[in-house]
């Protein structure tokens, strides 16, 4: 499935040069490099403090494609061409069974106020939602359904944050409502991890 999905992405996204990285080690790291304005996929633990760690016990092939600075030119807000600003996630990571839509928010400090953390989390949800809906639309317009490649249950939106905001069901109704709006718009459940097993 990963090869068919990858081939489809290559057909749909031809405007900007990007790399397709394929690795199959037991431990992998994806991280966002602000200096290079793109994400990287590596076996090196050098940047583990700001990485999404991928546990790959079966050592099967996992693919990484940078979205912001890869599929879409870094900083380009009107990538759809409708004269509106659209956000996008940082990268796609996928194998034959699951597709991860990843947004990194690793540059916050441990003592950052909860309101600021929530602002980062909320913005990350928007980034993932906007790109996911765009990706689905691009697939449909080309005659394919994204869900022919990955079912909703196997599409995992991940916000990679060291320090996540508190979300208590009774005290944070607004935050829970925002997460529910994300779920209603995408039919996906937002996750917050710094480590994930594929």
Where are these regions (language model features)?
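Short, low-complexity, polybasic intrinsically disordered segments
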Residues: 152, 156-198
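Catalytic cores of nucleic-acid endonucleases
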Residues: 115-160
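Short acidic, S/G/P-rich loop/turn micro-motifs used as interaction or catalytic elements
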Residues: 80-83, 107-110, 164-170
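Catalytic centers of nucleases
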Residues: 85-93, 124
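Basic, amphipathic N-terminal segments that precede the first structured/catalytic domain
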Residues: 1-84
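Conserved catalytic cores of phosphodiester-cleaving nucleases, focusing on short active-site segments
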Residues: 91-93, 98-110
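Residue-level detector of flexible, active-site-proximal loop/helix-junction positions
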Residues: 24-27, 108, 197
């Amino acid at each position: 499935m990963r090869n068919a999905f990858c081939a489809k992405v290559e057909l749909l996204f031809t405007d900007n040069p990007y790399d397709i990285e394929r690795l199959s080690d037991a431990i992998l790291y994806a991280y966002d490099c602000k200096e290079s304005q793109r994400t990287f996929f590596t076996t090196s633990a050098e940047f583990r403090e700001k990485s999404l760690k991928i546990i790959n016990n079966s050592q099967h092939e996992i693919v990484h494609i940078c979205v912001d600075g890869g599929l879409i030119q870094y900083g380009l807000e009107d990538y759809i061409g409708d004269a509106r600003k659209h956000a996008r996630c940082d990268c796609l990571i996928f194998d034959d069974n699951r597709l991860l839509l990843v947004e990194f928010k690793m540059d916050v400090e441990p003592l950052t106020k909860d309101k600021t953390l929530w602002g980062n989390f909320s913005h990350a949800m928007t980034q993932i939602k906007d790109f996911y809906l765009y990706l689905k639309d691009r697939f449909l317009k080309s005659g394919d359904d994204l869900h022919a490649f990955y079912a909703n249950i196997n599409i995992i939106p991940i916000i990679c944050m060291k320090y996540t905001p508190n979300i208590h069901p009774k005290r944070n109704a607004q935050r829970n409502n925002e997460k529910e709006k994300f779920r209603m718009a995408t039919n996906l459940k937002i996750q917050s991890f710094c480590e994930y097993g594929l």
